[in-house]
Amino acid sequence: MTDSTASKFYHFKVLLNEFFLDKKKIRSTTDLVKMASHCELKPGVDYAQFHQLYDVAEAALNEFMGNQDIPAFIRNAMVYLQSYAQLLPTFTERSSDKSLFQQFSTPQDIAWVLIQLANIKIDDWVLEPSAGTGSISSLLKKSLANRIIVNEIHPFRNWLLTEQAYHNIFREDAAQIHNLPKFRELVPDKIIMNPPFSRTIQTKAKVDVLAGSKHLLSSYKLLKKGGRLILLINASFNKGSRGYTFFQQNAPDHHLVMNATIDPETFKQKGTHFETRIMVIEKNPEKKIHIPHAEINEDNISEILELNRYNHG
């Protein structure tokens, strides 16, 4: 990327930030293109595909939210995060890059839930192996600062993370990070991940039903003993599935704390309608706890998070 293009993207983010400060909605993708054009960003010159503009907008919102004070009360936090997420237009374009890399970002209200389930302490090291535009990690920056490890293989999204000034940034295939010396030196206490559902870099366009489990296993191998991994994955990844069975056979010391589906409409704004689930996994824990809920919804989210805090002690 040239310095000129980087400067234009910077001014684009400044303009976006003004919208966020005023809580002004960007109503359509056409409006987003007009805003980019106002900053002299030209298609085919400064960006190749529209989704890059959306990625910048998403990264700008993530960075903005990372500097806000999220309400402590669970329902207030969810409403607060959802109100800002609605400022971006609904994303429906399925670009070749997004399909290949399975780049479907985590909605920030769900990201916040994943973080709560992780029970993160102030001295924990936290890894996000497929960080995208920083939807999850951005909500941790105020409290953890340089103890966040982000990895993103896509070059443009990796650049967006660099622009957000993370201290520990890598650009590697998340399905192989356990094999890399620089990652084996890391022993994260907590891992929060939203891996590709059905493709890996190796298989490219071909569907790989073990894609999610390969990413999961690679990250799990790095996890500290007694550590906790929070997984957002497609709903078909469940006990008895090929993917989970593969992980179970290769990670016999794991303990499944929670296994619950979430509302499929949650991902609507991010360009996919897949039904998803959240798994909370611990590595060889001293005390095995269990959160029995099979579904997460608006009615029980407070109960689940309170139970999680109580069990954590």
PLM feature spans:
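Conserved Class I SAM-dependent methyltransferase catalytic core
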Residues: 114, 208-268, 274-280
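Conserved beta-strand segments of alpha/beta enzyme cores
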Residues: 147, 167-170, 255-258
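Conserved phosphate-coordination/catalytic loops
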Residues: 104-109, 206-213
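Short, glycine/charged-enriched secondary-structure capping and boundary segments
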Residues: 141-143, 163-166, 184-185, 205-208, ...
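Flexible, glycine-/basic-rich loop-and-beta segments that form/coincide
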Residues: 268-313
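Class I S-adenosyl-L-methionine
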Residues: 2-165
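Structured loop/turn residues at beta-strand edges in well-structured enzyme cores
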Residues: 164, 181, 186, 254, ...
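Conserved proline-anchored active-site loop of SAM-dependent methyltransferases
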Residues: 111-142, 150-154, 172-206, 218-223, ...
